[in-house]
Amino acid sequence: MKNYHHYYLPIQTHYLLDAYGNQRRVRILLPKDYEKHAQKHYPVVYMHDGQNVFYSKEAYSGHSWKLIPLLKQTTEFPDMLIVAIDNAGEARFDEYTPWPLSAENQTLIGFSGGAGQVYSEWVVTVVKPYIDAHYRTKPDREHTLCAGSSLGGLIVAYMGSAYPKVFGSLGIFSLASWVSEEAFLDFVSNHPLQKDTKVYIQVGTDEGNEVDQALLNKNSNQAYIDSSLWYYQTLLQGGHEMDYLWLRILADEQHFEKYWADHFGEFLAFSFAEK
């Protein structure tokens, strides 16, 4: 375990064996006064694509989610732990897709998909228990949040439905469920969330890129919007109350960490607001 201090907020690093026997980096951002309050327990936000969470220099796009300055500068949120789980590199696509892709998409993308169920089980049965055992968390679902973007958003939505008694708030940015839309919506329909689960759904109107367009028979910008709309509608049709849902379609925003970072504070405010 390594300990670093940046912006007066301590980050601790652990390496946990993943479902395939590989060492996976998991970092925990702690409140600055964590060591001073030995009896205090904290809510936890679990985030995927952990390489992109804290520092722009190691983020895939060159821009992180900027969570350290956000938490340092914002006083309206309760103190919390941020758990950043690194993705599996080249195996990221497989790990964040719960269902195998169609043969056509497998050929186009070069990945088969379908390892998301194993990954999700690892997060719930290995990572979360480890964090709860080694840190002063509030382990109940009300204080357990999960957030991610793109395919990371897909795995968040899946985990919310697969483990409704674990996660009380979901942050789903630029949902890329279009890679397996039918299977995704069918699963969500048949695995309802707890009635008070909060779901923040954000998508921009300029999400698509050339890679996405090559995989789709329609406008890739619209594909991302449709995925978010269909997910939102499926939750409503399943009886989820609108007060616990927040769908945001943001003009001109793109598939990029900058835009997710710009609104992460709003996800946290929504999650921690009293109903």
Briefly describe each language-model feature range.
Residues M1-K275:
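Non-catalytic cap/lid and distal C-terminal segments of serine-dependent acyl enzymes
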